């Protein structure tokens, strides 16, 4: 424990004993003084930052209790007291009798020193180790002195053989010659150098006979064991650990302590060395110490003595456990796999594997665990080679399986497309039957109406006939009565009371001629003659060559073709943006004559100033003309430069002559001209301006050989009859099958998805549940509704519960699982919605119409040219196009029906909006189901944890149960840390050594593979919180 005060004491004073002060009820000081004293206590306790932070949060009452507890212990002896006593034991001039008296209390002094190093505050330890006291040097020297007699016993010096003593002294001098004296204090660079240097340090000053006899007295006691405990206490502090690791021979002396006859001491040494191996940089130091051990003890092989002790001292289980643990760690804690195999082979040569086979059936469970841990960590090179070969075979198998899976995937896609086609075909048949049913219903209704009408007419006629039968006798009686009355009254009397105008109406009309039909309207006048065509043809570009300027008449404008200019030197390019020839007319440039200006300029000086670099002397223009005349004549080009260059590139790709290309276009030969080339060539259909320029060139009867290859091709190309229609027809012929294969699956997807969505009963029930919950939530505020837009399905995730942990969709998924489990897989009834969601029906219908127009173009061309290629194409593909058009109509009708069925408008809701609603809903529903399952598992874990905590509280009432729980938690935590992918690293922090030793006693060391690291470590947080 940390202490605040210390009092000096001489070497003869009694040992340091913790003095328990009476508890007393000391009143609490003022807050300022309390904080000062509490700060001192915290600094003396040397706690980690997080633990110190927790203590600072205590209230003043708890702080005062802690101060009182800490101040009950005071250090009676300062560090130099123990140092002086140890130095007195090392005095070579002391008489043997006096030494016997002194050495009687050596073990007691060392034990008190160990307690002080372990329990006193860090300030006391630092004082013991500072440069003034050099307590570590004194302690290591005493350890060396205590066991030097053991080293001489290995040479048979127990009997005092002078020859052997001289031999050892001579051997020591030869070792001393390996290193110069000034190199003794330098840090080690490798194991061999360190071993040689430490041997020199140990034996450069050999002890006398009196010192050896004194050493034998010490070796018979527990001084070596307690010295190791003191060093272990020092190394448990970061400051002390660094000092021990940098000490010239501290670790070597610890390793040499393995020669002690006490098995407890050997076990303690091995535990300490194993812990050092697991600290960063410690493994190299331990190996160097055993190199030194080999030189000092004259081993033939490193670790030879260790294996000898391991085999011979089988009666002490603790030592064997510690030895097996050390071997496991020193071999398997390295990251370099090759070095690990090397260390493993070192112990194999020393007979470790044979001994382990004999010891595997030991009765000690601890030893069995350590042996099994080593065997589990063994790096089997042969097995790795076999695994590598197996891996190669497995990789080949994986490739085969991947290829097989690829074929199966393709087959699955084909089956899916075939299934979709069948569904679409059935849907089309269903729609056709529905249409027929509607027609039959309509016919039935019309027939029923006609029958009803006929029955009504028959009934009316029968009633009229009956009335007539009843009225005929009366009519005859009235006629007879009326005749008699007319006979009594004359005709003049009848007409006397009638006005003249009425008499005229009663008089019969005079006969008239038959009315002739009206003549037809005059024909409309003939339309006026069309106006003259405007000048739309662009003027021809200037033609290169040495020919004189030529004036071409194009429409109403005249463009003079400029002759090319020959220069003496190559000149740089002026990157201007040129106007096109058809843009010149009406501008200022049409009024300029730059050729006339050239006659007035000093062109020689211009070329000299602006010529490009690295050119030879100027060429004589006359000579140049003569040489040019000897060469092939320069070509004339009529096409625009970039267009001509692109055309040349396209023609080179074809690898055909102009005649072959034009002949193939005449015959619609797609074998000679691939469709890709046809589509590229369609970009170079001659414009009207180009045709005029080419025709003008021909009318002038200029030689065609002077034209560039592109211009000659364009000349032949433009003479092809109905060129535009032929090229469009060829492109249609070449792309028809691809378009058909592209459009058919899209239409089938629309048809199949529309049918599945419309006919899904489970989807209807899901919507019914959503409608019910929505009305339940909204009825009090907005009133109940009879339906909702499908876009409302996206809002199910936005409606969250009060604790914000669940959405309405999660609740629906939970409700379906509990109340309607048959609806849980409703999405299996919605076929092909994902494919339909990616279809733009409007574009597909436009493409189908384009195919129809293209087929009509082929029909016209076939009627004009009667080409066999076109006839064969029509006979083969007209039926396919008709079927595609019917499918398009069916898809449109099926989609319109399903959209209206769900209350949407086909005009405002395309398939790319309608079907993705279902895709998102299905995906969100599945995720909600998974999250519900995860939440359920988490709740179960929390419930079990809560029950375990309650049981733990009940069981933790007894100390034994509490310790058992702590131990189980510690082991579980350690195993979790071992299983981590990224291993934490032990740094040199306070408490590290004790943490490692505690861990290794609880859990055996487990090595890592080459890819994951090969060492077991604990992280810093584990030191601070769980103390391993």
Swiss-Prot record:
All copies of domain FH2, residue ranges: 561-951
Compositional bias of kind Pro residues: 12-28, 517-541
Recorded topology in the membrane: Lipid-anchor
GO MF term list: actin binding; GTPase activating protein binding; small GTPase binding
Keywords: Angiogenesis, Cell membrane, Cytoplasm, Developmental protein, Lipoprotein, Membrane, Myristate, Phosphoprotein
Recorded family membership: Belongs to the formin homology family.
Subunit and partners: Interacts with SRGAP2 (via SH3 domain).
Name this protein carries in UniProt: Formin-like protein 3
Lineage, uppermost ranks: Eukaryota, Metazoa, Chordata, Craniata, Vertebrata
Designated gene of the protein: Fmnl3
């Amino acid at each position: 424990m940390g202490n605040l005060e210390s009092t000096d004491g001489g070497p003869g004073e009694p040992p340091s004993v913790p003095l328990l002060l009476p508890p007393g009820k000391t009143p609490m000081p003022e807050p300022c003084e309390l904080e000062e004293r509490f700060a001192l206590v915290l600094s003396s306790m040397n706690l980690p930052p997080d633990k110190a932070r927790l203590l600072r949060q205590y209230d003043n009452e708890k702080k005062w209790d802690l101060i009182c507890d800490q101040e009950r212990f005071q250090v009676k002896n300062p560090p130099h007291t123990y140092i002086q006593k140890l130095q007195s034991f090392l005095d070579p001039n002391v008489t043997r009798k006096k030494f016997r008296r002194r050495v009687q209390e050596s073990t007691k002094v060392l034990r008190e020193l160990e307690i002080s190093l372990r329990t006193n505050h860090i300030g006391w330890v630092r004082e013991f180790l500072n440069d003034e006291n050099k307590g570590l040097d004194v302690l290591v020297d005493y350890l060396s002195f205590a066991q030097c007699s053991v080293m001489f016993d290995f040479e048979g010096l127990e009997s005092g053989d002078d020859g052997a003593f001289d031999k050892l002294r001579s051997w020591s001098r030869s070792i001393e010659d390996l290193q110069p004296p000034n190199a003794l204090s330098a840090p080690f660079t490798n194991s061999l150098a360190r071993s040689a240097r430490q041997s020199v340090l140990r034996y450069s000053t050999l002890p006398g006979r009196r010192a050896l006899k004194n050493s034998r007295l010490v070796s018979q006691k527990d001084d070596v064991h307690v010295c190791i405990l003191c060093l272990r206490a020092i190394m448990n502090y970061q400051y002390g650990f660094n000092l021990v690791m940098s000490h010239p021979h501290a670790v070597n002396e610890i390793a040499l302590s393995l020669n002690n006859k006490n098995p407890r001491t050997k076990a303690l040494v091995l535990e300490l060395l194993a812990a050092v191996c697991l600290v960063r940089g410690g493994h190299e130091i331990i190996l160097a110490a055993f190199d030194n051990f080999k030189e000092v003890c004259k081993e033939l092989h490193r670790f030879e003595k260790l294996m000898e002790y391991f085999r011979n001292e089988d009666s002490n289980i603790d030592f064997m456990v510690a030895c097996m643990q050390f071997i496991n760690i020193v071999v398997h804690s390295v990251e370099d796999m090759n070095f690990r195999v090397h260390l493993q082979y070192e112990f194999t040569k020393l007979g470790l594997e044979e001994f382990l086979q004999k010891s595997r059936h030991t009765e000690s469970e601890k030893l069995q665990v350590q042996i099994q841990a080593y065997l589990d960590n063994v790096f089997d090179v042969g097995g790795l080679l076999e695994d590598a070969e197996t891996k190669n075979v497995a990789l080949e198998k994986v490739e085969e399986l991947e290829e097989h899976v690829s074929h199966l995937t393709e087959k699955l896609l084909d089956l899916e497309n075939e299934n979709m086609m069948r569904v679409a075909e059935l849907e089309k048949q269903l729609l056709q039957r529905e249409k027929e049913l509607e027609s039959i219903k309509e016919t039935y209704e019309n027939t029923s109406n006609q029958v009803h009408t006929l029955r009504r007419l028959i009934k009316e006629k029968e009633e009229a006939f009956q009335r007539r039968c009843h009225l005929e006798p009366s009519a005859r009686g009235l006629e007879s009565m009326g005749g008699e009355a007319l006979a009594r009254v004359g005709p003049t009397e009848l007409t006397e009371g009638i006005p003249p105008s009425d008499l005229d109406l009663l008089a019969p009309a005079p006969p008239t001629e038959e009315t002739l039909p009206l003549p037809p309207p005059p024909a409309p006048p003939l339309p006026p003659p069309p106006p003259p065509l405007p000048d739309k043809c662009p003027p021809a570009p200037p033609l290169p060559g040495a020919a004189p300027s030529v004036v071409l008449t194009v429409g109403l404008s005249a463009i003079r073709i400029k002759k090319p200019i020959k220069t003496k030197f190559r000149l740089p390019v002026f990157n201007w943006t040129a106007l096109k020839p058809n843009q010149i007319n009406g501008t200022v440039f049409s009024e300029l004559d730059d050729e006339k200006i050239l006659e007035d300029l000093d062109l020689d000086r211009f070329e000299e100033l602006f010529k490009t670099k690295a050119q030879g002397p100027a060429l004589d223009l006359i000579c140049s003309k003569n040489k040019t005349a000897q060469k092939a004549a320069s070509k004339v080009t009529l096409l625009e430069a970039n267009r001509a260059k692109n055309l040349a590139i396209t023609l080179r790709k074809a690898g055909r002559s102009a005649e072959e290309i034009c002949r193939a276009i005449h015959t619609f030969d797609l074998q000679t001209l691939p469709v890709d080339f046809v589509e590229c060539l369609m970009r170079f259909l001659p414009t009207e301006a180009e045709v005029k320029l080419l025709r003008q060139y021909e009318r002038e009867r200029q030689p065609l050989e002077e034209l560039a290859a592109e211009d000659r091709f364009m000349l032949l190309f433009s003479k092809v009859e109905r060129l535009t229609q032929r090229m469009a027809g060829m492109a249609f012929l070449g792309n028809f099958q691809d378009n058909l294969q592209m459009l058919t699956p899209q239409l089938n997807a629309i048809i199949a998805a529309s049918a599945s969505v419309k006919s899904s009963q489970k989807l209807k029930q899901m919507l019914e549940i959503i409608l019910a919950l929505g009305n339940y939530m909204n009825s009090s505020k907005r009133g109940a509704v009879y339906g909702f837009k499908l876009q409302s399905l996206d809002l199910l995730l936005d409606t969250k519960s009060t604790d914000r942990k669940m959405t309405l969709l999660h609740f629906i998924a939970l409700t379906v699982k509990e109340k309607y489990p048959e609806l849980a897989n409703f999405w299996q009834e919605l076929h092909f919605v994902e494919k339909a969601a990616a279809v733009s029906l409007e574009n597909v219908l436009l493409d189908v119409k384009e195919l129809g127009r293209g087929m009509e173009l082929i029909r016209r061309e076939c009627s004009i040219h009667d080409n066999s290629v076109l006839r064969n194409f029509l006979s083969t593909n007209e039926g396919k196009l008709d079927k595609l058009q019917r499918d398009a109509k069916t898809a449109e009708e099926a989609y319109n029906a399903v959209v209206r069925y769900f209350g949407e408008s086909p005009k405002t809701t395309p398939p790319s909006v309608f079907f993705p609603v279902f895709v998102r809903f299905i995906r969100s529903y599945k995720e909600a189901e998974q999250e519900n399952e995860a939440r359920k598992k988490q709740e179960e874990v929390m419930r079990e944890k809560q029950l375990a905590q309650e049981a733990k509280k009940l069981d933790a009432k007894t100390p034994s149960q509490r310790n058992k729980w702590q131990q189980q938690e510690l082991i579980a935590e350690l195993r979790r840390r071992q299983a981590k992918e990224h291993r934490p690293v032990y740094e040199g922090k306070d408490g590290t050594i004790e943490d490692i030793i505690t861990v290794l006693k609880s859990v055996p060391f487990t090595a890592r593979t080459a890819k994951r690291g090969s060492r077991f470590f604990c992280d810093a947080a584990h030191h601070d919180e769980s103390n391993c």
